[in-house]
Amino acid sequence: MSQAEFEKAAEEVRHLKTKPSDEEMLFIYGHYKQATVGDINTERPGMLDFTGKAKWDAWNELKGTSKEDAMKAYINKVEELKKKYGI
């Protein structure tokens, strides 16, 4: 998987006809962050930040995943979402 394919997928996911489920969006978020930043480098958000905690958890689950593996999973998921929701 190339950086260009990853960037194309990141752009395409913004143009889906229907918004993916929260679970699908957390998958996308976690893999995007792992591919672009690497292992999580922030503290878990506070008790009342439910969205922030969910996003943090999705990214934290990928700790140790290589950039290439995260990019590949991200691209594959975007392709799946394009078939499911249209673009």
UniProtKB/Swiss-Prot annotation:
<dbReference type="GO" id="GO:2001140">
    <property type="term" value="P:positive regulation of phospholipid transport"/>
</dbReference>
<feature type="domain" description="ACB">
    <location>
        <begin position="2"/>
        <end position="87"/>
    </location>
</feature>
<feature type="binding site">
    <location>
        <position position="14"/>
    </location>
    <ligand>
        <name>an acyl-CoA</name>
    </ligand>
</feature>
<feature type="modified residue" description="N6-acetyllysine; alternate">
    <location>
        <position position="55"/>
    </location>
</feature>
<dbReference type="GO" id="GO:0006631">
    <property type="term" value="P:fatty acid metabolic process"/>
</dbReference>
<feature type="modified residue" description="N6-succinyllysine; alternate">
    <location>
        <position position="55"/>
    </location>
</feature>
<dbReference type="GO" id="GO:0070062">
    <property type="term" value="C:extracellular exosome"/>
</dbReference>
<dbReference type="GO" id="GO:1905920">
    <property type="term" value="P:positive regulation of CoA-transferase activity"/>
</dbReference>
<dbReference type="GO" id="GO:0000062">
    <property type="term" value="F:fatty-acyl-CoA binding"/>
</dbReference>
<feature type="modified residue" description="N6-(2-hydroxyisobutyryl)lysine; alternate">
    <location>
        <position position="55"/>
    </location>
</feature>
<keyword id="KW-0446">Lipid-binding</keyword>
<comment type="function">
    <text>Binds medium- and long-chain acyl-CoA esters with very high affinity and may function as an intracellular carrier of acyl-CoA esters. It is also able to displace diazepam from the benzodiazepine (BZD) recognition site located on the GABA type A receptor. It is therefore possible that this protein also acts as a neuropeptide to modulate the action of the GABA receptor.</text>
</comment>
<feature type="modified residue" description="N6-succinyllysine; alternate">
    <location>
        <position position="77"/>
    </location>
</feature>
<feature type="modified residue" description="N-acetylserine">
    <location>
        <position position="2"/>
    </location>
</feature>
<keyword id="KW-0256">Endoplasmic reticulum</keyword>
<keyword id="KW-0333">Golgi apparatus</keyword>
<dbReference type="GO" id="GO:0042802">
    <property type="term" value="F:identical protein binding"/>
</dbReference>
<dbReference type="GO" id="GO:0005794">
    <property type="term" value="C:Golgi apparatus"/>
</dbReference>
<feature type="modified residue" description="N6-acetyllysine; alternate">
    <location>
        <position position="77"/>
    </location>
</feature>
<feature type="modified residue" description="Phosphotyrosine">
    <location>
        <position position="29"/>
    </location>
</feature>
<comment type="similarity">
    <text>Belongs to the ACBP family.</text>
</comment>
<feature type="modified residue" description="N6-succinyllysine; alternate">
    <location>
        <position position="8"/>
    </location>
</feature>
<keyword id="KW-0379">Hydroxylation</keyword>
<dbReference type="GO" id="GO:0005788">
    <property type="term" value="C:endoplasmic reticulum lumen"/>
</dbReference>
<feature type="binding site">
    <location>
        <begin position="29"/>
        <end position="33"/>
    </location>
    <ligand>
        <name>an acyl-CoA</name>
    </ligand>
</feature>
<dbReference type="InterPro" id="IPR000582">
    <property type="entry name" value="Acyl-CoA-binding_protein"/>
</dbReference>
<feature type="modified residue" description="N6-malonyllysine; alternate">
    <location>
        <position position="55"/>
    </location>
</feature>
<dbReference type="InterPro" id="IPR035984">
    <property type="entry name" value="Acyl-CoA-binding_sf"/>
</dbReference>
<dbReference type="InterPro" id="IPR022408">
    <property type="entry name" value="Acyl-CoA-binding_prot_CS"/>
</dbReference>
<dbReference type="GO" id="GO:0097038">
    <property type="term" value="C:perinuclear endoplasmic reticulum"/>
</dbReference>
<dbReference type="GO" id="GO:0005783">
    <property type="term" value="C:endoplasmic reticulum"/>
</dbReference>
<keyword id="KW-0007">Acetylation</keyword>
<dbReference type="GO" id="GO:1903060">
    <property type="term" value="P:negative regulation of protein lipidation"/>
</dbReference>
<keyword id="KW-0813">Transport</keyword>
<dbReference type="GO" id="GO:0036151">
    <property type="term" value="P:phosphatidylcholine acyl-chain remodeling"/>
</dbReference>
<feature type="modified residue" description="N6-acetyllysine">
    <location>
        <position position="19"/>
    </location>
</feature>
<comment type="subunit">
    <text>Monomer.</text>
</comment>
<feature type="binding site">
    <location>
        <position position="55"/>
    </location>
    <ligand>
        <name>an acyl-CoA</name>
    </ligand>
</feature>
<dbReference type="InterPro" id="IPR014352">
    <property type="entry name" value="FERM/acyl-CoA-bd_prot_sf"/>
</dbReference>
<feature type="modified residue" description="N6-succinyllysine">
    <location>
        <position position="17"/>
    </location>
</feature>
<feature type="binding site">
    <location>
        <position position="74"/>
    </location>
    <ligand>
        <name>an acyl-CoA</name>
    </ligand>
</feature>
<protein>
    <recommendedName>
        <fullName>Acyl-CoA-binding protein</fullName>
    </recommendedName>
</protein>
